[in-house]
Amino acid sequence: MPPIPEENILSINIKTYGSFVKLPINHLAGHTVISIDVLRSSSCIVWGLVNGASKIIPVDDLGSAVSIASRMGDCVLAGERGAVLIPGFDIGNSPAEYTEARVGGKAVVISTTNGTGAICKSESASNVLIGSMLNCTAVAKRAVELGNDVILMCAGTGGEFSADDIYAAGAIASAIQTLTDAELCDLTRVSCLV
């Protein structure tokens, strides 16, 4: 990628949260949140879209997921709790399940232990993007195009950070740094070193 002319370089602040539980939702307006749950929600969502899902609808609670799916009719109901497929759901949270044959042309309603909670908690942000190792360069480019300060919001596990999410946050932050001038918080700096 050719360098961006200096007069076009945007300065973006990047802040990383190790767990969505710690995310201050009253400070999201004007920010682009990149929600990261590498193992597995984010990877499932990205892989589902790659394989032709018409849309992905993240839902925090199971009752709402079932209700939305039943109203929609022909859709795929996906989800897990504690890494276990939910009885009555079509698929769980393994990207290998999000094949073109399974999700192509269909809406996917997904509810997971951590990932969809992180996405839903971000709804007051100006923009919400899904980040994983599968799309770190593309999501970084889109975040820079949007021009807002960025929050890398790791889903974590049980309210604590997960190394896989921090690793992906570092890959995304590093990709953003190749595109623009960026101010990094300490956790973002550390994630870039992982």
Indicate where each model-derived feature is located.
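Phosphate/ribose-phosphate-bearing ligand recognition and processing surfaces
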Residues: A155-D165
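Short acidic, Gly/Ser-rich segments with clustered Asp/Glu that frequently serve as metal-coordination loops
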Residues: V21-L23, V33-I45
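Long, charged alpha-helical interface segments
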Residues: P2-P3, D90-G117, K121-N127, K141, ...
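A short alpha/beta connector and helix-capping loop motif
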Residues: S42-G63, R71-V76, R81
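Extended, compositionally biased flexible segments
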Residues: V66-S70, D74-I91, P95-Y98
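Solvent-exposed alpha-helices and their adjacent loops that cap or buttress functional pockets
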Residues: P5-L10, P24-L28, I68-S70, T99-V103, ...
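Acidic, polar low-complexity linker/tail segments
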Residues: N8-T32, V50, V59
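Structural motif
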Residues: N13-K15, H31-I34, S54-I57, D74-L77, ...
